[in-house]
From Swiss-Prot:
One of its GO terms (cellular component) is cytosol. It catalyses: L-methionyl-tRNA(fMet) + (6R)-10-formyltetrahydrofolate = N-formyl-L-methionyl-tRNA(fMet) + (6S)-5,6,7,8-tetrahydrofolate + H(+). Belongs to the Fmt family. Its EC number is 2.1.2.9. InterPro entries: Fmt (IPR005794), Formyl_trans_C (IPR005793), Formyl_trans_C_sf (IPR037022), Formyl_transf_N (IPR002376), Formyl_transf_N_sf (IPR036477), Formyl_transferase-like_C_sf (IPR011034), GART_AS (IPR001555), Met-tRNA-FMT_C (IPR044135). The lineage of its organism: Bacteria, Pseudomonadati, Pseudomonadota, Gammaproteobacteria, Pseudomonadales. Coiled coil: none annotated. SUPFAM superfamilies: FMT C-terminal domain-like, Formyltransferase. Attaches a formyl group to the free amino group of methionyl-tRNA(fMet). The formyl group appears to play a dual role in the initiator identity of N-formylmethionyl-tRNA by promoting its recognition by IF2 and preventing the misappropriation of this tRNA by the elongation apparatus. This is Methionyl-tRNA formyltransferase. Keywords: Protein biosynthesis, Transferase. (6S)-5,6,7,8-tetrahydrofolate binds at S109, L110, L111, P112. GO terms for molecular function: methionyl-tRNA formyltransferase activity.
């Protein structure tokens, strides 16, 4: 089959790698325009673009697919199928209609739960027992199309957004390759999603990563895991920023945000319900460290009675 691939981040690049190992012809790779990154704000290619160029694949980077010219360029490729993974651009119906077999998408959740931009982190944050990958036939709605294939994986008690991402990035490509084989053979039939079961995974932002100590400790512990490695939960102590990259549930009570105890086991902080033990922190200008290492050199900085987030 003649396949056009569309994707941008590393999660998508893993899918492109899998397609490179199939007999199908990759006629073009679509990815978002290069973006400024790093301290120098130098324009950097996406993970998908870098991989595509390594393998000599044509790369197309339109700012939008809404224009007639962009759609004509895609149609000229005569694709049988378009595979879309975390592309980041809206595909209008006119684009979805161009490939002979339409467009399929690998989405990092068990649809219809967690439609939207941040399904991996929202699943961890919500305390879901499992996550997975759904390969669906795309339609104009956001992640609403018929489901072709689903693969599930348990969410462990210590899973972070990063660890679950990596696991799904390994499961997704295999599911897409299997779905393409089924479509080519005409043996795959889509299952309509039940909209009544749908939830929406809103895009992450740095503002919501600020820890609200009035919330229950069990919720904050999940939030810390979900938001690692990005956007990283944070608070403040004595006016200085404090990034929280590891935490566990503790015992104790007090004014929300107050330090109950500091030891090599962690910094115990009172929450609206229960207490959270901070086990891995990053101070301004420093690198992430186990709290035991910070305690050895800065124990006076974490004296009990101080309040975080003020």
């Amino acid at each position: 089959m003649r396949i056009v691939f569309a994707g941008t981040p590393e999660f998508a690049a893993e899918h492109l790698k899998a397609l490179l190992d199939t007999p199908h012809q990759l006629v073009a790779v679509y990815t978002q325009p290069d973006r400024p990154a790093g301290r120098g704000q130098k324009l950097m290619p996406s993970a998908v673009k870098s991989l595509a160029l390594e393998h000599g694949l044509p790369v197309i980077q339109p700012p939008s697919l809404r224009s007639a010219d962009a759609q004509a360029e895609l149609a000229a490729l005569r694709p049988d199928l378009m595979v879309v993974v975390a592309y980041g651009l809206i595909l209008p119906q006119a684009v979805l209609d161009i490939p002979r077999l339409g467009c399929i998408n690998s989405h990092a959740s068990l649809l219809p739960r967690w439609r939207g931009a941040a399904p991996i982190q929202r699943a961890v944050e919500a305390g879901d027992a499992q996550s997975g990958v759904t390969v669906m036939q795309m339609e104009a709605g956001l992640d609403t199309g018929p489901m072709l294939l689903k693969v599930a994986t348990p969410i462990a008690a210590d899973d972070s957004g990063g660890s679950l991402h990596d696991r799904l990035a390994a499961l997704g490509p295999k599911a897409v390759v299997e779905a393409i084989a089924g479509l080519a053979a005409g043996t795959l039939r889509g299952e309509v999603q039940d909209d009544a079961l749908a939830t929406y995974a809103h895009k992450l932002n740095k503002d919501e990563a600020r820890l609200d100590w009035s919330r229950p400790a069990v919720e904050l512990e999940r939030q810390v895991r979900a938001f690692t490695p990005w956007p990283v939960c944070h608070s403040s102590l004595a006016g200085a920023s404090l990034k929280v990259l590891g935490a566990s549930l503790g015992h104790g009570s007090g004014t929300p945000g107050s330090i109950l105890e500091a030891s090599r086991d962690g910094l115990l902080v009172a929450c609206g319900e229960g207490a959270l033990r901070l086990t891995r922190l990053q101070l301004p200008g420093g690198k992430p460290l186990a709290f035991a290492d910070l305690y050895n050199s800065r124990r006076e900085q974490f004296a009990a009675g101080q309040v975080l987030g003020q």
